[in-house]
Amino acid sequence: MKRYVLFVCLLLSGLAGVYAQSIAPFQKGDRIAFVGNSITCGGHYHSYIWLYYMTRFPDQRIDIFNEGVGGDVAEMIYQRLDKVFEHEPTVVTLSFGMNDVGYMDFRKPGADTIARNRVEKACRDYALIEEVYKKYPEVRKILIGSSPYDETSRFNKVAFPGKNTPILEIVDFLNARAR
């Protein structure tokens, strides 16, 4: 069984590059705004990127702006996006999806329909975000798919069965938009 799990993990990690954008490294002087929800706000991944650049390329200074806000959904990101551009970023990353699909609705009857409606709304709201992006053609945009949700965890004694499926639908949508 352990060999099977290891094989599946290796296979999936090998396929990850198939769906990834080809992203150029940050350049000296880049001003990167990481936009998203609480995963961006408190996830620290942007500080690891900054630290990597500072320790590996000390002569290539980059500036990082944490523009993550806990609880945000795509609509809320759209509503505050002009403020993000006040920092005059040269690169903007965007991640959303976890909050967009909701939480407690997955424990209710009709959860699939509710989730489908939430995914559709998130995609419509992303179209509004793209309209703002068009005002800044010189800014490089990077889409980051939401992290997966562990439906099997009992850490908080509350699981939301089916939550990962609509998150993956949003990730697939973003992958399609990135091409």
Predicted feature residues:
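Catalytic nucleophile serine of serine hydrolases
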Residues: S38, G68-G70, S147
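N-terminal secretory targeting modules
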Residues: M1-V35, I39-I62, D82, E86-E88
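Alpha-helical cap/lid subdomain in secreted, periplasmic
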Residues: F26, S47-D63, D72-R179
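Short glycine/serine/threonine-biased micro-segments
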Residues: R31-F34, N66-V69, S95
